[in-house]
Each structure stands twice: as structure tokens, then as C-alpha cells.
Amino acid sequence: MKIIFAGTPEFAAVALAALHAAGFEIPLVLTQPDRPAGRGMQLHASAVKQFALAHDIPVAQPVSLRLDGKYPEVAAEAHALLKATPHDVMVVAAYGLILPQSILDIPPRGCINIHASLLPRWRGAAPIHRAIESGDAETGVTIMQMELGLDTGPMLAMQRLPITADDTTASLHDKLATLGGEMIVQTLRRMEQGDLPAEPQPDGANYAAKILKEEATLDFTQPAEQLARKIRAFNPFPGAAATCDGTLIKFWHAQAVPASNQLPPGQVIAANPHDGVLVACGDGALRVTELQKPGGKRLSAVEFLKGFTLEDKRFQ
């Protein structure tokens, strides 16, 4: 079976690597254009492009696939390339570009998507973040047949994965990426054998909106449990944060703990090597165990307090 693969970040690169290791022929990879990154803002290839080039797989990087969009000539070239490349199916994982119907219609066996949630829950851009932030007990991966709607297509496979109390978006991402790679290989093997029934998604969809940097600010009037989930959900991006004496401090790890104090939300209850950093919340308190100030490294609470005083301070 010949596969065109479309994806961009590390999540997609794991799936591409799994397909390559399983022996599937991959005549073409689509990925987003190189983007400026790092302090020097130099152009960097996506994780998918890096894997493809390392394994001599041809790469195309159209800026758009919409014939009626801003770059119709680029889109037309991409359409022509797909039609000229012999393949059976397209596998899509976190590609980042909208696939119009004219693209979905090209692969003889359609387009199959790897989505990091238990559809129809958490359709959209940030399913891993939102699952942790909302306190879901589990998530998983859904393999679906793509159609024009956003993550609305019939399901071909689904596997569940528990969300542990210390999972961050980073750790859960890695687990789901590995699971997605395993599942797409299994799904395509079943497709080769002609055994791939599709199941319509049930009702009850909700949407995982894109993460905005503005969401990163912690509101200490909220319950500690809610804030602890947010800190885990926003690790590594964009990093939950609060301001103390005009300095923006990022919170990377924290646990909710009971607290009977009457201190105002955001007030530092304790900040010492024995107790760590304890911050009053609307309900309970946060025990913060890893912090970072601007331009600095992530530090344990003990190390952080050696260079920054929080005793009797209040976070805003």
C-alpha cells in the first residue's frame, strides 16, 4: 500500500516513523513551510520534514491547498502533484492546513486522520491541553475517515488512555503520539485486508479551542484543583504564569492541597525550603514545586527561593 503522509509537528513525525518502520511505501510527504524559531528566528524545518529528508522521502510544503484561497497557483500545483503521485490513501496527523473537498477526493481510498482524543469529545486544535484542563479521567486516539467537517468523519479505530494525576500536556502528548503510530499501522493493515468497518460518531461533540497565550495567566480566586490542572495543561506551552512585584513567574509543576487559612487569593502562605512555595487560592492552596523567572531556567522551588524572595508576597 502506498501512502501520502501529511503532518507537521513531533506528534505527526512519530506516526510517520511508525509507518516507515512497518514497511509502507511513502512516495510523498506534505508538511507546512519552514518557520522562524529560536532566539535567532532562523528558519527551521518541521519534525516531519526532518524525518522525511533523513529517510529520502520526497517533501512538498505548500502554503495552502485551497484553490479559492489566497494562493490558488500554489494550491493548483499541490493538487497536480498529488494526482501525479501514485498512492492508495492519505494519512493526516496534525498537518495544520485545511484540506478542501478537492483534496479529500484525490486519494483512491480517501484521507485518514489520527486525532488525539476520544471523538466526538475534543474535536479541534488542542485536544490534549483541554482534556487535562477539564479534569478528564481518560483520553485516547481516534482514527477516522476524513470529511469536510472539523473532525466529524466516521471512526475506524479508537483506543483509550488514562490521564494520570501528574500528566502534563508534554507527557500525555508523547504517550498519545506513540499510541497513534501503533494504531495507524494496525488500521492500514486492516484496510489492506478489506476489514475496516466505519462507525459514525455519536452525538455530544465539544471543541478544543486553540490555546491562546492570554489564557496562561493564573486567577487565584479559582479553586486550587482547577489551577493545578491548568498548570499541567499549559506545560510546555504557553506556560501558566502569575505576576509578583511586577515580575512574571511561570509555574511548571504544582499540586492542590487543603488549606483552612483566610488569606486572600494569591497570597503566599509559605516560601521556604521546608514547605516550598504555598499559595492561597479561592478554595485550598497550591504547593508549587517548579518555577521560572524571565530569562532563567526552570528551577525546583528550593532552588528558586535561593535567588527570589516570595515570603509575604502576593501573586496577581
From Swiss-Prot:
It catalyses: L-methionyl-tRNA(fMet) + (6R)-10-formyltetrahydrofolate = N-formyl-L-methionyl-tRNA(fMet) + (6S)-5,6,7,8-tetrahydrofolate + H(+). SUPFAM superfamilies: FMT C-terminal domain-like, Formyltransferase. GO terms for cellular component: cytosol. Pfam families: Formyl_trans_C (PF02911), Formyl_trans_N (PF00551). It comes from the Bacteria. HAMAP family: Formyl_trans. This is Methionyl-tRNA formyltransferase. (6S)-5,6,7,8-tetrahydrofolate binds at residues 117-120. Keywords: Protein biosynthesis, Transferase. Its EC number is 2.1.2.9. Attaches a formyl group to the free amino group of methionyl-tRNA(fMet). The formyl group appears to play a dual role in the initiator identity of N-formylmethionyl-tRNA by promoting its recognition by IF2 and preventing the misappropriation of this tRNA by the elongation apparatus. Belongs to the Fmt family. InterPro entries: Fmt, Formyl_trans_C, Formyl_trans_C_sf, Formyl_transf_N, Formyl_transf_N_sf, Formyl_transferase-like_C_sf, Met-tRNA-FMT_C, Met-tRNA-FMT_N. One of its GO terms (molecular function) is methionyl-tRNA formyltransferase activity.
